[in-house]
Amino acid sequence: MLMPKRVKYRKLQRGRRTGTATRGSKISFGEYGLQAEECGWITARQIEAARIAITRHVRRGGKIWIRIFPHKSITKKPAETRMGKGKGAPEEWVAVVKPGTVLYEMQGVSKEVAREAFRLASHKLPIGTRFLSRELTDEG
């Protein structure tokens, strides 16, 4: 599971998800990419589930890059606990995603295989996504 080795602050405020991504919004490593169309939190488990879906479809061929990392800790209080008595314990780690962020990249496979692999991965994610190709982004 993805999580930071060390953090300065264990418990973070939730924050607001506004605006679009400027950094990390273009394909940098591979030929094809999966881009977020909505804002949201993607948990470490969801990132891993989507990665497994991609690798199972691609099998031996191709290289995959994960472009997001879960830096933010989400806290939860135990069930049936009264309010107060401090903030809950860190429960999971999430990546904060803005519209336009490239989530995954891939190369070494055909366009049809990449599109299908990213379609399977998108079903594991809680946000809307779209398929990117380097040839489409270079022209525009």
Curated annotation (Swiss-Prot):
NCBIfam families from the UniProt entry: rplP_bact
GO cellular component, one term: cytosolic large ribosomal subunit
Pfam families xref list: Ribosomal_L16 (PF00252)
Source organism (scientific name): Syntrophus aciditrophicus (strain SB)
Entries under InterPro entries matching the protein: Ribosomal_uL16, Ribosomal_uL16_bact-type, Ribosomal_uL16_CS, Ribosomal_uL16_dom, Ribosomal_uL16_sf
Family: Belongs to the universal ribosomal protein uL16 family.
Gene Ontology MF terms in the entry: rRNA binding; structural constituent of ribosome; tRNA binding
SUPFAM superfamilies reported in the protein's UniProt record: Ribosomal protein L16p/L10e (SSF54686)
Protein name: Large ribosomal subunit protein uL16
HAMAP family, alphabetized: Ribosomal_uL16 (MF_01342)
Reported function: Binds 23S rRNA and is also seen to make contacts with the A and possibly P site tRNAs.
Keywords assigned by UniProt, alphabetized: Ribonucleoprotein, Ribosomal protein, RNA-binding, rRNA-binding, tRNA-binding
